[in-house]
């Protein structure tokens, strides 16, 4: 079988990494969701021993229905979490003390999928549109308010059933996840049914790495070590996508997460594109001030933020 030898090699690598005795500083990282290729750089950094080499004993603890990543961060159960920029900014606006220590997704994977052709975001006026219950949905909601559009937002958990059943006119989706699900559900989507936010002037950064302000100030060494090792992980992913898929599938099996290689291949391919800055064509792993300002503007004008958040407040408190 194609996977057998690779899995054996990966298991051996993980065993060797776990056997390193001089990594003493234990920290916990929590992704946004269950195990999937969206977090490949972290899995690789763990499996290949990059965290151990940096002097860290990293535990990857995925969120549950009763314990989200941000809840774990607030309780001190996790020191590092992945958050999208939009909800992170809303939380800071509400008084939470968060620091962006690494921005790895430089582009937006958010899109609108519609039953009818879309000319622009304004085409959603008067429509029923599915949205995620939390997170990135705040951006299009704010944009709709800014443009004075009459959109009925219908919350969904994580599936595409509302759209497939015809209960809604359109739905928000991530190009690396829900778009694939819709295609696998038999939806024959034409180009004019797909509206990518990044193609219509709203290309905001998404997934980044966050810590609390207190942890940032008292554990700068650990923060720097974790960031550098994670960047090394993502760079390895970009250079070895096929081997990365095997590592991702291994972590999914270990956590009891169900998926298939084809779905994770799609996700990894799309996520690798999001790592690249749209103007420089490079992976910078830093929060782009221009993208940050655009996000600030949309969220403020759409009433999500009470006042603008400064770049320094976000990255260097």
Walk through the language-model features, giving the residues of each:
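Short, glycine-/small- and polar/acidic-enriched structural segments
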Residues: 25-165, 169-174, 196, 203
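Pocket-lining segment of extracytoplasmic ligand-binding domains
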Residues: 86-87, 158-162, 168-257
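Long, low-complexity C-terminal extensions of enzymes
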Residues: 300-317
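Sec/Tat signal peptide C-region and signal peptidase I cleavage site
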Residues: 18-23
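N-terminal secretory signal peptides that target proteins for export/translocation
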Residues: 1-4
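Secondary-structure end/capping motifs
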Residues: 218-304
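Sec-dependent N-terminal signal peptides
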Residues: 7-17
């Amino acid at each position: 079988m194609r996977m057998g030898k690779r899995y054996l090699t990966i298991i051996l690598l993980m065993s060797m990494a776990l056997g390193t005795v001089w990594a003493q500083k234990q920290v916990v990282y929590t992704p946004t969701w269950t195990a999937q290729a969206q977090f490949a750089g972290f899995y690789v950094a763990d499996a290949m021993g990059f965290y151990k080499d940096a002097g860290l004993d990293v535990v990857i603890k995925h969120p549950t229905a009763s314990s989200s990543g941000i809840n774990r961060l607030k309780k001190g159960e996790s020191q590092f979490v992945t958050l999208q920029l939009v909800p992170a900014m809303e939380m800071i606006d509400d008084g939470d003390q968060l620091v962006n220590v690494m921005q790895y997704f430089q582009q937006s994977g958010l899109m609108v999928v519609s039953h009818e052709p879309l000319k622009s975001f304004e085409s959603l006026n008067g429509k029923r549109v599915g949205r995620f219950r939390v997170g990135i949905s705040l951006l299009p909601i704010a944009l709709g308010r800014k443009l004075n559009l009459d959109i009925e937002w219908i919350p969904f958990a994580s599936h595409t059933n509302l759209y497939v059943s015809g209960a809604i006119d359109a739905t928000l989706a991530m190009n690396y996840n829900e778009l694939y699900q819709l295609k696998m559900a038999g939806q024959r989507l034409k180009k004019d049914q797909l509206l990518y936010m990044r193609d219509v002037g709203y290309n905001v950064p998404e997934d980044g790495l966050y810590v609390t302000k207190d942890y940032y100030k008292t554990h700068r060494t650990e923060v720097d070590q974790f960031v550098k090792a994670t960047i090394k992980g993502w760079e390895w992913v970009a250079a070895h996508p096929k081997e990365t898929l095997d590592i991702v599938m291994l972590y999914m099996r270990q956590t009891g997460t169900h998926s298939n290689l084809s779905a994770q291949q799609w996700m990894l391919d799309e996520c690798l594109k999001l790592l690249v800055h749209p103007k420089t064509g490079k992976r910078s792993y830093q929060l782009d001030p221009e993208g940050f300002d655009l996000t600030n503007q949309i969220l403020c004008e759409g009433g999500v933020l009470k006042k603008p958040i400064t770049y320094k407040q976000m990255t260097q408190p």
